[in-house]
């Protein structure tokens, strides 16, 4: 059996550009792409923390070290500059890979869209 699992996540990235007439749907700083294990043309889901919008598109490379998160084409209508978003990708993972210790790549970034940490799991949510 295969399971559809979280593969990659870039958590709380700030939108730096919204380019309605640019080809390609989400340009992501190449450093962030690599850290999250994402590649060009990979399907991604974007969840806008500010307005609740959720949509799918694909990743393209943004300038390395720039902190770029550019929503392009129709995706530009789903956010405003400065909105915080979560960018995620999923993969089909078989039971053997899961048993062997397969883990997602979670990337946490600072206010300038620079990497501040990595994790391979989402912590248990507690009632507090």
Swiss-Prot record:
Record's catalysed reaction(s): L-aspartate + H(+) = beta-alanine + CO2
GO cellular component, one term: cytosol
Cofactor: pyruvate
EC number: 4.1.1.11
Cofactor note: Binds 1 pyruvoyl group covalently per subunit.
PTM note: Is synthesized initially as an inactive proenzyme, which is activated by self-cleavage at a specific serine bond to produce a beta-subunit with a hydroxyl group at its C-terminus and an alpha-subunit with a pyruvoyl group at its N-terminus.
One annotated GO molecular function: aspartate 1-decarboxylase activity
UniProt-annotated catalytic positions: 25, 58
Sites where the protein binds substrate: 57, 73-75
Assembly behavior: Heterooctamer of four alpha and four beta subunits.
Family (UniProt): Belongs to the PanD family.
UniProt cross-references to PANTHER family, sorted A to Z: ASPARTATE 1-DECARBOXYLASE (PTHR21012:SF0)
Function text: Catalyzes the pyruvoyl-dependent decarboxylation of aspartate to produce beta-alanine.
The protein, known as: Aspartate 1-decarboxylase
Protein source organism: Burkholderia cenocepacia (strain HI2424)
């Amino acid at each position: 059996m295969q399971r559809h699992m979280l593969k990659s996540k870039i958590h709380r990235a700030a939108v730096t550009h919204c380019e309605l007439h640019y080809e390609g749907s989400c340009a992501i700083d190449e450093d962030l792409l690599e850290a999250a294990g994402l590649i060009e043309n990979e399907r991604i889901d974007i969840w806008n923390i500010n307005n609740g919008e959720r949509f799918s598109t694909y990743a393209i490379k943004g300038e390395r070290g720039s902190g770029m998160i550019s929503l392009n084409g129709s995706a530009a209508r789903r956010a405003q500059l400065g909105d915080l978003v979560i960018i995620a990708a999923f993969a089909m993972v078989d039971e053997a890979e899961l048993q062997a210790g397969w883990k997602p790549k979670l990337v946490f970034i600072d206010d300038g869209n620079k990497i501040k940490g990595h994790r391979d799991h989402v912590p248990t949510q507690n009632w507090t």
